[in-house]
Amino acid sequence: MAATSPHLTSIPQAVRVAASIDPSIDPGLKQQAIDYLTKVKQLSEETWQDCLQLYLQGAGAPGPSTTGRDGKEKLETDMRMFCLQVVDTVLIQKPEVMGADAVQGMYEAIVEFIQVEYIGGSCEGGQGFLRNKLAFTISQLFLRAFPSHIPTFLHPFFALLSPPTSSPPNLHPQLLTIRLLLEIAQEIHDTTLKTARIMTKERQERDGVVRDVIRSSGDDKTAVQGMLGIIEKGLEQMNSGNSSDKWAEAVDATLKTLSAWIPWIDLGVALNPTTLPFYHRLLHQPILSFRTATAGIYRTLVAKGIQDPSSRLQVLRVLAPVAVIDPLETETRGGKSEEVATFRASLGVVLSAYGVALIGISDNTEVAEQLRNEAEEMMNPALPLLLRFLSDRQYEVPLSVSPFVSDLLRIYKRMYKPPNPSTKAGQAPSPPSTLPQLSPERRQFLASMLDILIRQLAWPEDTEWEAPGNEDELDEDIAAFKNFRGSCRSFIESIAQIDKSLHTEVVARIVIATLDAYASGGGAAAVPWQQAELAMHLVYTFGEVSKNSTRAAFYELPPEMATKAARNKLRAAQGSGRTTPSSSDNVDLGPSSNNDRLEYEQFPLSPLGQLLTRCMTSGISSYPHPSVTLQYFEIIVRYIEFWKAKPETLPGLFEALLDGQGIHNSDEGVRRRCFYLFSKLCKDCRNDTVEGMVSPILDSMRDMMVINAELPPTDTPDEDPLIKATTGKSYVADQLYLFEASGNLVYLTKADPAKQMALLEAVAGPLLSGLGSGVERARVDENDLQAVLQVHHHLMALGHFAKGFPIVPDKLVELLPYTGPFKQMAEALLQAIEILKRRRVVRDAARFAFSQFANAIGTPVAELVPRFVSAVVTEFEPSELVDFLLFLQLLMHRLQGSTFETMDMLLLPLLSRIFTVLQQPVTGTDEAQVHARLKDAYLAFFTSLMNENLDGIFITDRNKPEFENVLTTLFNLTQDYSDGASQRLAFGFFSRSVIAWGTSPEAAARPSVFAESAMASQSKMVSGGGTAQPNAHAVTQEQRAKQCLPGYENFIYQRLLPAAFEVPANSQFNIRGGQLIVHEAAVLVRNTVQARGQEAIDFMLSDLLRRLNCPSDIANQLIASLTTQQAKDFKKTFFDFIKAMRG
């Protein structure tokens, strides 16, 4: 007699202890139980048979703790679930430990269990989750046993598909089998489920074999016939009123399983003279869930992947989706319930699959023309039905036919869309190529589709409008509408690309009808707000079709004039040093360009210009719903070039944005959006007309510029109210746009310095007063958080006010009347930061404001930089260092040489803080992110020092003792193969360093070793003595030679130049993702030759390349490329050379 396994008693005991909620149980004992059960699962190859025995015992018992047919007690449910999990573990993760005998034994035991429990027993008390869990386990056993061990695995289960004859019916055996068939289909075919599995080649081959054998053995036919039989019986019983709920559950489950089998079984099994009429009958059942599931089956049949086009067309004819769907669409049209919408969407999916299939044939040039024509003829009757689905106001229904619409418009675009002209600047456009014209029928179809899509853009009548704000907190209905609106817009734009005139006609008709109805006296009563908002939305998006935001978009220019305008813009761009013309270039090209100035107003308005004029004259800006007026303001800002050409309209536009419809609107969301739009208007509309209105405009907006510092409630005791108040979207954050706008406006009055100073004082005075009172309160009580927040807000407002002033060249700074006031603001900022330097939010605001003051007046603030830096440099948190380094880079770029002393003073303490942080252990993802960002930031900071010709800071008396350590640290980063970003930045630093510290007097005195062909325009400037950075002051090569650092050439030859070759050639280097690193190394090589001349070439040929075992002919070719190719070409050559070195 075999010994009884101790697991048979230990597992039940452990599960009871581990699952117990009895507080008297010793926690140590409970932990022992949990540890034991964990080991049972880990050693599933040894324990699975015991677990299977425990699960199966007591079969036929009425419930847990009662005796079954085998004379044993059925165990508790949670215990049996654990046992099945162990069995699943061995089946899924360790199937190889189960031999043929074990598989056969398990199979027979489970079949016997089902016979006892589900045929003659309590069916697990009807608990569906237990039935489903067993079905999953059987499916995993099936995949282990079929077809090699047990080819008839499914036959006992097929027998269970016979409809029950008992009353009330026992459907649990059928439901178990249906679930088993579903689990099998999902395992071997369902793409969604398969993505969650580790898909090996062996697994894919196994799944393919299982599908093939099921098909070849006829098991698919048996399964489908069994499932159809259950559905048939269920419908019959439900129509008779017998156990409707039980049968409805069975039919629903069977339809779901049938849907999972049909995609991969033989078409003849799923579609034949018996099944097709059965599907038709199901589609007309009164229960919508059955109809929806059947539509899914129908869609699968329509989309079935049949390779032969002729056979596929034949199948589509047999299915006749249009004839099937048409009456169903008519019957359900107007239904508002969610179930009806879901069913209609499922019908739309069928139609869409049908259309996509036909387009796939008609658009395939490899298919015989006759078949392509047949496919197109079959598609034509589907088009009116497509439009009906598109017009449904329940979003999921029109979205269901999106693939059909997309494919249809795609082929129309290819057939009818004019190609983009490949005209070079200054040349006349080439004559348009001849394209076939849209037939009247297709144009009418597109017109109908366009009309439907445009009307679908209107807000639903049952959805309450909300002003744009935090998109993350959008109401679900509004979010769904905006998503749907975006889909419709993409289709509208596609139609416009196919036939721009059609788009213009339809949009103009709808917009003009709406504006006329409103302007004729009907007002809001005649035009619902949804219709008015739609008209404004259409005008707003109209310009997107032309892709032209210049003034030419508003006028009908003759072709020759349009070309002349383009030439004028190009001349203006070249004359101003820009490479991209701006829209203002054709307004004023300067005194020497007056002959090229184009007077647009002499030409008739384009459709967009006409629509904008109608908007302006219709009075729609006074519509009493914020959605309409806000969209009107969006139009004003988007098409500002149009209004700038009509100065007489500007006072009205500003007045509208300033009144109760705009920044004074009672709706906070509208008001906040208008703050931004008003700022944009002020920034983009700087002309004489606006200059004359500055004073009244500022007077009108002054009450909106009162800053209220309100501390928000915190959600947890640890939450910092200051951080919460200053992050994310807030009212004050939007209010700051008004201060930027006021800066733009005050600057416009530059022709009258006295007036400008008065207006500047009117804006900045209250801000400085509020700043001062907040600082004083915080000085008296350092825990007064509201005072701290007040200081933050006023500093940010001052910064945004300064942001409204343009960056002025240093040579003009002395002429600025506002230099003194801004310097006073900077002084006030310093007083604030010296008192509140320990507050993170104040430091953040102070950095922003100070950088804006530096932009506005330049070098006069340079003398204040040391004081500012001294106040804050010791206070930074590790995460704040990154922002501080970016701040210093901004100052260096704006103030350039004026920051040398500050950076000299700052370098060592800054390096100390940086490396202290980087040397701390990384204990989590937050620290890892801080380390990565800080490393990138300090490397970018070092590079900026080099770019701004501040390289001398590294070798001052103060910093020179640490210079070697800095070089060593950076050099080590070039060897760090785990951090490609740092490698690239380190190589970039060294490529600049060889010019700064390694230029030899001999190379500077001799002719360049580079051939003329190697000189791009920038390279020629460099070879003549300039630096490689276009934004830095030019430093001649002779000056560089005088600054040459003795001994640095040794570092170049011994460390840097070898690293440029060896690092990317190393096997640890990721060559695929490291192309930019190799390019930086190539720049290092090239700059070394530039700095050292022939000496560097001789070193590479006679020493370095030989040590790298580079053949002499290859080495000579590399040097020849180096001295004759431009930098961008040599980067590619060097990359190819490195790849060859790696083999």
UniProtKB/Swiss-Prot annotation:
Which cysteines does the record link by disulfide bonds?
Answer: none
Compositional bias segments (type: Polar residues): 576-593
Q: Region Disordered: list its residue ranges.
A: 566-593
The GO biological-process annotations, alphabetized, read as: tRNA processing; tRNA re-export from nucleus
Localization annotation: Nucleus; Cytoplasm
Q: Which domain of life is it from?
A: Eukaryota
UniProt keyword annotations, A-Z: Cytoplasm, Nucleus, RNA-binding, Transport, tRNA processing, tRNA-binding
Name assigned to this protein: Exportin-T
Per the UniProt record, the source organism is Cryptococcus neoformans var. neoformans serotype D (strain JEC21 / ATCC MYA-565)
